[in-house]
Amino acid sequence: EIAYGEMDSLLARKIQQLMTFFGLLIPDMTNEEEQMLDEALIKTYRDFGITHDNDSVYEDKSQFPPKMKKMPVLGDLPQAPAGNPMTQRLAAIVSRFVTGSAQSFNRQTNVDLSNKYIVLDLSELKGKLLPVGMFIALDYVWDQIKADRTQRKAIFIDEIWQLIGASSTRMAAEFC
């Protein structure tokens, strides 16, 4: 595994994580759709001032830990251009998570990780939303853990098979 400090681009790592997330949402995504999504993600992060320059993710690097910029949410992705069936399909699937019944995924994470023990209860998520929610929670926790490597931490994940089980994607299993 490549540590953040050894990676060429934090943005590339984040987009790789997002491609895994979208792979859970859209398991039959074509190569062309993946390319269009990749371009849309890079543009979205660029609109937030975040580029492949790792320093661009920080609002203030003089603090410890450094203060990061506000990150985009799903609703910040550009709207699909009219007339393009591939982007229209992606937009239709993602709209459930932006304005539809799963719009709670379209916001900044508000989990306080300063307590000694933290429980992320995803028991209310059912069906296709459970692996998506588990992936998002695990991705967030992993990013927080890697932010300060001076502290020892342990993660216990109940029901992880639902993220990496038979109905999941190879990319999600590799992430875990």
Predicted regions and their residues:
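P-loop NTPase motor domains
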Residues: 1-176
